Amino acid sequence: MFKMVSSPHTHSGKLTMRIMLWVILAMLPAMGVQLYYFGFGVLIQAALAISFALCLEGIVTVLRQKPTLFYLSDFSVILTALILAMAIPPYAPYWLILIGTFCAVILGKHVYGGLGQNLFNPAMVGYVVLLISFPLQMTTWLPPIQLLNEPPTLLDAYSLIFTGFSTDGFSLHQFTQSVDAITQATPLDSAKVILKEGVNDNTLLQSPIFEAGFAIGWWQVNLAFLLGGLFLIWKRIIHWQIPVAMLVSFTLLAAITELVASIPYLKTLPHLFSGAMMFGAFFIATDPVTASITPRGKLVFGALVGFLVYIIRFYGNYPDGVAFAVLLGNICVPLIDHYTRPRVSGHRQ
C-alpha cells in the first residue's frame, strides 16, 4: 500500500540543527586564532551573546506560542550570536554585545516571522546598528597581545568588558601605550585614515601591526576562516559560488585599482586577508535564508557583494564594508532570483 503525499518527494537529509552545528564547528578554529592573538575577550563576548540570544529566543517563542525547545534546539540563534560576538572588538563594553544581540534576534529575525522568513542576515543587522550608533566602541581594538608588554589576563578581560578597567586599574587605552598609537584601530581603519592624509602605503606598512605586508593577527584569523569555509564546501554545507564570486569580484577590482589609481592603497592580497573578508565570504554571505537560491543567482549575488565591499573599502567612509555589502546584497536577492531562475523546459519565462 502506497501513501500519496505532496511534493517535494526527496530531501537532502541536512536538518537545520545539523547544518548549524557544522557551521559552528567550522568557525571554532578562527575563534581559537582570534583568542590567541587578541586575548580572552572573544570568549566572554561569545558567552554573553549566546546566553542573551537564547533568553530572547525563548521569550519570543513563548509570546508567539511557538514550541520553545524546538526553536532553541536548532542552534540558529547560537550561530547568529557567535557571528556577532566574533565581529565586534573583543574588549568592547558588555552592553554593546547585548544591544547588538537584541537587534540581531528581534529586529533581524523575529520581526519578519522567525527563521526562514527574515530578509536580512540577522547578525549583520545587529552589527550595522552597533557600528552606526557606537562608532568609537566598535572601532577600538587592542593590538595583537604579542605586541603588548603586559597582555590582559582572563580576569583583566572580564574586568575591562564590565568596568572599562583591568584588575590593576588600567584602561584599554593604557594597554596600548607601549605600541604605536594607530594600533587601537583595525589595520583597515588605520589604512583609511593614514592614506587619506597622503601618506604612502610603504609608510603605513612600517607600523608594528604589519609584518611582511600583512596585518599581524588579522591574516591568521582570515586564513582560519578560509580553511573553515573550504571545509564547509567539502561537506556540502555551503555552495562554492557565493564565496568564489565574491572574492574574485573584489580581487579583480582591487588589483585594477592597485595598478592604475594614483591614490595609494593597501595591496590587494593584504586586503583579502584583513577585516572580515574571509569571514564574510564563507560564513555571512552564504546564509541560505538571505542569499540567492538559484545557481546563477549565487554567482551574481556573490559578485555583487564583492563589488560593494570594494566600493565601500576604497571610496566609502567605512574601512571594511562587508556588513553593509551583505545587507545591500540581501535587498537585491528577490530581483536576482527572479531573473536567474532556471527556465522550465517547454515554457517561456
UniProtKB/Swiss-Prot annotation:
Keyword entries, A-Z: Cell inner membrane, Cell membrane, Electron transport, Flavoprotein, FMN, Membrane, Phosphoprotein, Translocase, Transmembrane, Transmembrane helix, Transport
Membrane topology: Multi-pass membrane protein
Main location group: membrane
Naturally occurring in which organism (per UniProt): Pasteurella multocida (strain Pm70)
Location relative to the cell: Cell inner membrane
Family, per entry: Belongs to the NqrB/RnfD family.
Protein name as catalogued: Ion-translocating oxidoreductase complex subunit D
TM regions (residue ranges): 24-44, 77-97, 98-118, 125-145, 214-234, 237-257, 269-289, 299-319, 320-340
Cofactors, names only: FMN
One annotated Gene Ontology cellular component of this protein: plasma membrane
Keyword hit for Flavoprotein: yes
Subunit structure, interactors included: The complex is composed of six subunits: RnfA, RnfB, RnfC, RnfD, RnfE and RnfG.
SS bond partners: none
Lineage: superkingdom: Bacteria
Keyword Ligase: no
Sequence positions bearing FMN phosphoryl threonine: T186
Biological role: Part of a membrane-bound complex that couples electron transfer with translocation of ions across the membrane.
Lineage: Bacteria, Pseudomonadati, Pseudomonadota, Gammaproteobacteria, Pasteurellales
GO terms under biological process: electron transport chain; transmembrane transport
Uppermost EC category: translocase
Pfam family, one: NQR2_RnfD_RnfE
EC number, UniProt record: 7.-.-.-
InterPro entries: NqrB/RnfD, RnfD_bac
